């Protein structure tokens, strides 16, 4: 049977591309090298900020020597080309009035809120232990500012409320009540609440990228393991769920790898459908 004509490979990072030690295994790296040599664009698709994904893109030499690559960050809030100039290929940003409104809400709830800049994780509470987890996860420094709404004079793809897990449900419900129909709010961990533009998702941004390239979903393979990967796995011509994926994610997949993220599941998918 002929292999699908895959031109774009979208890969979630944690639990998919990387193993539990946050490393890309040699077999997976070799499979990616072969796919890139065939002209396939590799899109690193993550909920992390762009700066938090950039080290992985550099490690894979995406955007160098004809190795086509892009970073899909903020769960689809932006797609940035890995080539010179880091062109923004697609983005959705929070309405400007939402920045002070969200900061005011966080202050009323006595919880930290952060956003992102090229310098790192920006917040009025750089010593907050829950906010510091976002810096640790992304290997980015905490940048303390006296007044976040004043500091943020640039487009914002995402803000993140960080808090003790005990407070998650009541704060989330209060936020949903206050911002209904204006932005999307959802928990991404027991201590994080994402605040993003309405409708942000990995499938929507990938559709925009494919349209820009003159391609269709039939030219896309997407691999993931988490709930935020469901949309792109369902949308892709070849949707791949890792063996370690959650049940609802596997339900959206065309193919479930026999191997998990610790045993070259991504390499298995690349070898089966691309090489």
Regions inferred by a protein language model and the residue ranges of each:
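Hydrophobic packing residues within well-ordered alpha-helices of enzyme cores
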Residues: 28, 53-57, 171, 175, ...
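Short, hinge-like loop/turn segments at secondary-structure boundaries
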Residues: 59-63, 88, 130-134, 202-203, ...
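Asp-based phosphoryl-transfer active-site loop
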Residues: 5-21
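Short, structured coil segments at secondary-structure junctions
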Residues: 60, 67, 75, 179-181, ...
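Active-site phosphate-binding/coordination module
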Residues: 26-130
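Conserved acidic, metal-coordinating active-site core of Asp-based
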Residues: 105, 109-223, 227
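Short active-site oxyanion
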Residues: 39-43, 68-69, 158, 218-219, ...
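Mg2+-dependent phosphoryl-transfer enzymes with acidic/Ser/Thr/Gly-rich catalytic loops
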Residues: 3-8, 25, 194-275
């Amino acid at each position: 049977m002929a292999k699908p004509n895959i031109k774009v490979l979208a890969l979630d990072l944690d639990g998919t591309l990387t193993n539990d030690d946050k490393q890309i295994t040699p077999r997976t790296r070799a499979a990616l090298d072969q796919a890139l040599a065939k002209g396939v664009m590799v899109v690193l698709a993550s909920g992390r900020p762009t700066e938090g994904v950039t080290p992985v893109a550099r490690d894979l030499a995406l955007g160098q020597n004809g190795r086509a690559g892009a970073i899909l960050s903020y769960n689809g809030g932006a797609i940035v080309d890995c080539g010179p100039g880091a062109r923004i290929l697609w983005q959705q940003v929070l309405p400007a009035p939402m920045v002070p409104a969200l900061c005011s809400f966080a202050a009323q709830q006595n919880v930290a809120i952060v956003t992102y800049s090229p310098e790192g994780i920006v917040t009025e509470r750089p010593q907050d232990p829950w906010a510091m987890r976002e810096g640790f996860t992304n290997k980015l420094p905490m940048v303390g500012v006296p007044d976040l709404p004043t500091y943020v004079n640039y487009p914002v793809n995402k803000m993140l409320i960080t808090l003790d897990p005990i407070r998650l449900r009541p704060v989330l419900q209060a936020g949903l009540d206050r911002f209904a129909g204006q932005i999307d709010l959802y928990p991404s961990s027991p201590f994080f609440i994402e605040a993003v533009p309405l409708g942000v998702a990995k499938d929507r941004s990938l559709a925009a990228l494919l349209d820009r390239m003159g391609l269709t979903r039939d030219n896309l393979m997407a691999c993931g393991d988490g709930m935020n990967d469901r949309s792109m796995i369902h949308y892709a011509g070849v949707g791949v769920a890792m063996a370690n994926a959650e049940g609802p994610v596997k339900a959206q997949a065309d193919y479930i790898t026999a191997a998990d993220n610790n045993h070259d599941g991504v390499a298995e998918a690349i070898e089966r459908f691309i090489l």
